[in-house]
Design a protein with these regions (language model features):
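Phosphate/ATP-binding catalytic cores across multiple sugar-kinase/actin-like superfamilies
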Residues: 57-60, 212-234
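Glycine-rich phosphate-binding loops at beta-strand->alpha-helix junctions
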Residues: 1-4, 233-253
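Glycine-rich phosphate-binding/hydrolytic loop that grips phosphoryl groups
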Residues: 35, 52, 56-63, 212-216, ...
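Gly/charged contiguous loops adjacent to phosphate- or pyrophosphate-bearing nucleotide/cofactor binding elements
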Residues: 152-214
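Glycine-rich phosphate-binding loop of actin/hexokinase-like ATP-binding domains
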Residues: 8-26, 44-47, 59-150, 250-272
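Conserved catalytic cysteine-centered active-site region
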Residues: 28-51, 56
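Non-transmembrane, aqueous-exposed alpha-helical and coiled segments at domain scale
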Residues: 70-73, 129-132, 222, 229-234, ...
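Beta-strand segments within the central parallel beta-sheet cores of soluble alpha/beta enzyme folds
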Residues: 75-77, 169-173, 234-242
């Protein structure tokens, strides 16, 4: 993002070994960027760290405050590239993983960003399979699609209710479970008459498989960082989760589906758009 902001060719970041064209940029003025401010006002850009760990993660780490604490903290920024930072005031290590766009509603048939009409939370009755949806927007807002936090809840609830197995395949039939001509299952969250768009809102086995890959990338990145410093999840005192995937994440559900490490829920903190805050 820093490259695009200052108009520098970002090609090097896309090609192995993924080295940014610059790390720090000094002497930049508002006039250089045509910003609506005093043209001589200096502009500071959060420095790139390396590879896919850019200035947004520098800003997010600053906002999280983990750099100024004695306790060991984990900072997770959920997006198309998932970035992880681990450490305390003595050291910080980071890595990036290709999680794909599932956390932001991409690669999901009814996915969307966390805007009006997005299903951001869900519970499912184990007996009737009826879902209870929390939707972004006014109280009478009908669902339009599913955002990242909603996907986490839905998959966790489907697994808890025995509707899908650990591979994300539908193993229980019911009024909310439908199958296409090829036998692929889907769970209907809102029928055509219940949605804002007049189209069915559902989550299918391909959606679930895409999400399993995304959450697996995040968990693998966390394990990679911990292994690099010869530590286990027991060393984690705080977990800060960022990303524009909803107004909040049900951390228990995220742990249940193997997306986050199994630590005490009190250690989790959702901090929203940390890049903007930083």
């Amino acid at each position: 993002m820093n490259h695009l902001f200052v108009g520098v060719d970002a090609q090097s970041v896309r090609m192995e070994p993924y080295v940014p064209s610059f790390f720090h940029w000094d002497g930049l003025l508002a006039g250089d960027l045509k910003l609506p401010a005093n043209p001589l006002a200096p502009v500071q850009i959060a420095p790139n760290i390396g590879s896919y760990v850019g200035g947004d993660i520098t800003a997010g780490t600053l906002a999280s405050g983990i750099w100024d604490r004695d306790e060991m903290s984990l900072f997770i920024d959920l997006g198309t590239n998932g970035e992880i930072v681990f450490g305390n005031r003595d050291f910080l290590m980071s890595c990036a993983c290709s999680a794909g766009p599932a956390f932001e509603g991409g690669d999901i048939s009814c996915g969307m960003r966390a805007t009006d009409g997005a299903i951001e939370a869900c519970t499912i009755d184990k007996e009737t399979m009826d879902p209870t949806l929390t939707i972004v927007g006014d109280p009478d807002q009908k669902p339009v699609g599913i955002c990242g936090s909603g996907i986490i809840d839905i998959i966790s609830e489907l697994f808890r209710c025995g509707i899908i197995n650990a591979k994300g395949l539908f193993v229980r039939e019911g009024k909310r479970v439908k199958r296409d001509a090829h036998g692929m299952g889907r769970f209907v969250l809102a029928g055509e008459h219940e949605s804002e768009t007049g189209r069915e809102i559902s989550i299918n086995e391909v959606d679930i498989d895409n999400f399993i890959r995304a959450k697996g990338a995040i968990f693998s990145a966390i394990e990679t960082l911990l292994n690099a410093v010869d530590m286990s999840v027991d060393a984690i005192d705080h977990v800060y989760v960022a990303g524009g995937i909803g107004s909040g994440i049900n951390m228990k559900n995220a742990v249940n589906i193997g997306m986050f490490p199994d630590v005490e829920l009190e250690k989790f903190h959702y901090i929203g758009n940390s890049s903007l805050a930083g």
